[in-house]
């Protein structure tokens, strides 16, 4: 029994050592091992933190039916700066895990990212910063996905989150421009289409263009 335990621990330590030392090796085994470690260890734990933080925000939000309901339940604290430290330990955990995934498991070989989970890490990084109301750093993370991973399966989600962040920064005209361009793409899925129109409606309302807002909300 003890021999089997020792063998298992030895194999696990050896595998961990290989993963830790392999970010520049251009082989399928190393791509697979880094992607696996990123997804099922680091990003999983970060995702749990992110989900818990979002649940806490929703639990602490109360609808005022005498006021226009926002697209997203999140109370904005006006005196925060873009460099403020995270307020939530859940979002701090998510940001730390995303950063760890990027720093330890990114496999940029020949100018191309070989770890298929790194775009997910940047998306989590941006979301954690967004919910912590550090919108400028969040925008940096979303823009990085659009610049570095144009063929990512998460590209539409990243575009939606970029515009959510732009709206929080008061860039409503830019949101309308970018979302209108996004909606020209006939390949967008129903949820992306719905999120995009909700953002358009909110941005038009922020600019006090009520007729345009109503038209988009009806979509």
Question: Can you annotate each of these PLM segments?
Answer:
Residues 3-6, 21-219:
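Acidic, polar-rich low-complexity tracts and alpha-helical solenoid repeat scaffolds
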Residues 4-14:
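Sec-dependent signal peptide recognition
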């Amino acid at each position: 029994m003890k021999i089997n335990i020792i063998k298992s621990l030895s194999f696990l330590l050896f595998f961990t050592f290989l993963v830790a030392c392999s970010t520049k090796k251009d082989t399928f085994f190393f791509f697979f091992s880094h992607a696996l470690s990123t997804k099922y260890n680091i990003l999983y734990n970060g995702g749990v933190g992110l989900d818990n933080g979002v649940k806490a925000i929703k639990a602490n939000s109360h609808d005022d039916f005498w006021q226009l309901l926002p697209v997203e339940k999140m109370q904005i604290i006006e005196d925060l700066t873009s460099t403020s430290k995270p307020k939530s330990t859940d979002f701090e955990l998510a940001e730390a895990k995303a950063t760890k995934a990027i720093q330890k498991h990114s496999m940029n070989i020949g100018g191309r990212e070989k770890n298929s989970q790194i775009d997910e890490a940047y998306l989590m990084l941006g979301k954690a910063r967004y919910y912590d109301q550090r919108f400028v750093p969040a925008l940096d993370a979303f823009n990085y996905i659009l610049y570095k991973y144009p063929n990512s399966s998460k590209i539409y989600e990243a575009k939606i989150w970029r515009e959510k962040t732009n709206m929080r920064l008061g860039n409503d005209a830019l949101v309308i421009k970018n979302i209108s361009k996004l909606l020209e793409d006939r390949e967008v899925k129903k949820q992306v289409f719905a999120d995009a129109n909700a953002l358009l409606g909110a941005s038009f309302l922020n600019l006090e263009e009520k007729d345009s807002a109503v038209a988009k909300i009806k979509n």
